[in-house]
Amino acid sequence: MLKFVVLIFVVIMASTFAEQCGDKVCGEGTCCSEFPVVHCRELGIVDDLCMSPGETTDSGRYLFFCPCETGLRCDKNDWTCKQDSSRSE
């Protein structure tokens, strides 16, 4: 029972301290993520878990993870950010 109470406390604290997001509230370099609570999350860097751009819910938020930073792509084989090898340099 104590573990459950601690878990609830942590979730409430996380939702209190996380920047709540909605229409255009998240700043540059972030996206709005719905899980575990609706909050702004940083865009993915190399090897972070990611969602592809445009894979949002009906509310326009990303379900679990943000897309990758500019210059990276979300590899659908393992859902992580990788260097975009299609860029011409």
Curated annotation (Swiss-Prot):
Keyword Ligase: no
Pfam family, one: MIT_LIKE_ACTX
Domain of life: Eukaryota
Prosegment residue ranges: 87-89
Gene3D superfamilies registered for this protein in UniProt: Lipase, subunit A (2.10.80.10)
Localization annotation: Secreted
Keywords: Disulfide bond, Secreted, Signal
GO terms for cellular component: extracellular region
Matching InterPro entries: Atracotoxin (IPR020202)
Tissue: Expressed by the venom gland.
Disulfide bonds: 21-32, 26-40, 31-66, 50-74, 68-81
Signal peptide: 1-18
Keyword Signal: yes
Family: Belongs to the MIT-like AcTx family.
Protein name: U1-hexatoxin-Iw1e
Organism of this sequence: Illawarra wisharti
